[in-house]
């Protein structure tokens, strides 16, 4: 393998921006996860009726978000955390689609939030995955 290949010479184009982006993502998932414990009623309202154990699933997803957010901190766990966050967001996408359908059927005044949330979810998936593509040995300086 060429020692000067892209995999061995990775350098973020904007290292300060990438670092800020990482810290922002860590804060986002830790705070969002904590919010699952403080505002459970918000999450219960958007959970599909056909899924049971709403309270338990809200707490479990909150714990997952906190743990995955914290796993973004060490360089050696960042890649797997980013991949798992991407997968988690893909799983959550179907909940947001169901919320959109329910809001549409019920002519909910918050339909616009459900509409905006879908493309935002794709941005969040891309954002998380962008940290999965950084070679672990290089990290973010």
Task: Give a label for each model feature.
Residues 2-141:
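Membrane-interface extramembranous regions
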């Amino acid at each position: 393998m060429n020692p000067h290949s892209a995999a061995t010479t990775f350098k973020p184009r904007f290292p300060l921006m990438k670092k800020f982006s990482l810290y922002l993502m860590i804060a986002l998932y830790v705070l969002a996860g904590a919010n699952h414990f403080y505002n459970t009623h918000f999450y219960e309202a958007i959970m599909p009726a056909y899924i049971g154990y709403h309270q338990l699933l809200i707490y479990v997803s909150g714990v997952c978000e906190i743990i995955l957010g914290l796993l973004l901190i060490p360089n050696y766990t960042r890649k797997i955390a980013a991949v798992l966050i991407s997968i988690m967001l893909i799983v959550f996408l179907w909940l947001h689609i169901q919320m959109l359908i329910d809001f549409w059927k019920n002519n909910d005044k918050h339909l616009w939030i459900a509409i905006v949330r879908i493309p935002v979810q794709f941005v969040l998936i891309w954002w998380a995955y962008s940290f999965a593509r950084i070679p672990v040995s290089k990290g973010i300086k």
